[in-house]
């Protein structure tokens, strides 16, 4: 398989259409990438301040072709957070948008020592300027791209809507897989609540739509299932667990319309993807994550590290595969480190496996509290509240014997508290329910739990 970053320089197929309706062929994109790659020294460290635009895409691909190492960052990153990263990692170059488009700025810094296999740096999921980065190798990128193409059956006829952030592994995986197959990317920075988003989808006949759980909640409120989108063939969901009720609703609707609905599972530490639920199983298995992607393997381990083989037992989900990344970096010197994981990733997620070999995520290993001696899953509490009070959003955090629940409908605080105490059979003093205007989320739609934890008593 030719690496996706090595574009077909003789192809006049359309590679990219942006939200100004400007199209670039593979030939044109390859020329722009080659021109920039010639100016980049091999093994240079490059900060790519990106959005979903052809300019940002050129920077990303040029780095990979030149064997420079890009760190993908949101172009709207707060200046103080960017400065923190600049101080820690001291990159040689920044690729960023200026008054006349994207341009390369030489920072006159010597290149750090970097492992030969290091291809890409990306911030950990939910990170907001944290210096903790995931180190991804060329082999990681190739292996995960190949697996995703395999189970999604991506071909050159696809026209993928690329609206998830390019600095987020889910968004980046859409770009990688479709470029690898010579398909078309529809790049946009708008979202579902903006009218231009749906005009763009319809005008350019998008064949696939992807989103995180929060995206699908918004789509439900927008009555997405009533929209006329005749070109749409594939729906994908990753970035967290979808509510089983919404999973069931979307899967049933997709099956009725002849669409494919994929529930998927992944992490930055696994390049992007680890698991998926085949569309033909989606309607009958609400809340189920699925099976390992082609070339990967799952196992469950108990607290001692012993493998759990019995169906229905809970344990930590462990993934094995070529897409397991090299490890983390928290400082410049870490870029010289080699493979610290050796193809094994303890995900930190608790899961169970049924008799058919399908896995269900039940919560984060760190998202369980002891409340008056009882083990309480915070993810399960959130699910209970949202189902019983559908008009509110909910996030649960806290510490042992003190569960802090934040809801967006403050008028229901006492009702939620009483409901949780009764349903969980715990004294009401275990719960503190607070109204909040909006749940803080990052650009990828993931909840920023640390911001809420900082508000706790």
Language-model segments: what does each one mean?
Residues 11-12, 106-123, 130, 135, ...:
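Conserved pre-ATP/AMP-binding loop-to-beta segment of ANL
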Residues 48, 321, 326-327, 343, ...:
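AMP-binding/adenylate-forming catalytic core of the ANL superfamily
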Residues 206-211, 220-285, 297:
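Gly/Ser/Thr-rich phosphate-binding loop
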Residues 12-41, 83, 136-139:
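Conserved AMP-binding/adenylate-forming core of the ANL superfamily
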Residues 22, 36-76, 163, 375:
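Conserved AMP-binding/adenylate-forming
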Residues 23-26, 119-146:
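Conserved AMP-binding A3 loop
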Residues 291-295, 306-338, 376:
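Conserved ATP/PPi-binding loop(s) of AMP-dependent carboxylate-activating enzymes
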Residues 142-159, 169-208, 293:
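Conserved AMP-binding/adenylation subdomain of ANL enzymes
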């Amino acid at each position: 398989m030719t690496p996706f970053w090595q574009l077909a320089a003789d192809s006049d197929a359309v590679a990219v259409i942006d939200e100004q309706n400007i199209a670039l062929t593979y030939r044109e994109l390859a020329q722009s990438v080659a021109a920039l790659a010639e100016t980049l020294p091999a093994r240079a460290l490059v900060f790519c301040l990106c959005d979903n635009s052809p300019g940002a895409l050129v920077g990303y691909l040029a780095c990979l072709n030149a064997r420079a190492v890009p760190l993908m960052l949101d172009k709207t990153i707060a200046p103080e957070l960017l400065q923190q990263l600049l101080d820690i990692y001291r990159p040689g170059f920044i690729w960023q948008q200026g008054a006349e488009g994207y341009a390369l700025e030489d920072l006159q810094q010597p290149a750090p020592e970097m492992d030969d296999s290091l291809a890409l740096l990306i911030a950990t999921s939910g990170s907001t300027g944290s210096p903790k980065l995931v180190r991804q190798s060329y082999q990681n990128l190739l292996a995960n791209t190949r697996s995703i193409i395999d189970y999604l059956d991506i071909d050159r006829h696809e026209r993928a809507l690329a609206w998830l952030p390019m600095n987020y592994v889910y968004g980046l995986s859409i770009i990688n897989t479709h470029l690898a197959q010579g398909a078309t990317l529809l790049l946009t920075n708008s979202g579902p609540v903006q009218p231009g988003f749906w005009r763009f989808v319809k005008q350019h006949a998008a064949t696939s739509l992807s989103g995180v759980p929060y995206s699908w909640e918004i789509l439900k409120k927008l009555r997405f299932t009533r929209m006329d989108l005749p070109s749409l063939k594939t729906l994908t969901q990753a970035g967290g667990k979808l509510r089983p009720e919404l999973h069931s609703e979307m899967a049933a609707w997709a099956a009725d319309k002849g669409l494919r609905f994929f529930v998927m599972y992944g992490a930055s530490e696994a390049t992007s993807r680890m698991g998926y639920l085949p569309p033909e199983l989606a309607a009958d298995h609400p809340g189920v994550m699925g099976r390992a992607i082609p070339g990967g393997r799952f196992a469950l381990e108990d607290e001692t590290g012993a493998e759990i083989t019995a169906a229905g037992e809970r344990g930590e989900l462990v993934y094995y595969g070529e897409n397991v990344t090299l490890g983390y970096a928290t400082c410049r010197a870490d870029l010289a480190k080699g493979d610290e994981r050796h193809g094994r990733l303890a995900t930190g997620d608790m899961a169970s496996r049924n008799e058919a070999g399908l896995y269900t995520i039940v919560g984060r290993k760190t998202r369980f509290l002891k409340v008056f001696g009882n083990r309480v899953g915070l993810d399960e509490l959130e699910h209970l509240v949202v189902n019983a009070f559908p008009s509110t959003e909910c996030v649960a955090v806290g510490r042992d014997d003190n569960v802090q629940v934040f809801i967006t409908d403050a008028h229901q605080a006492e009702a939620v508290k009483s409901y949780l105490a009764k349903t969980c059979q715990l004294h009401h003093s275990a719960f503190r329910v607070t109204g909040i205007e909006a749940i803080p989320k990052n650009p990828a739609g993931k909840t920023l739990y640390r911001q809420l934890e900082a508000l706790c008593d």
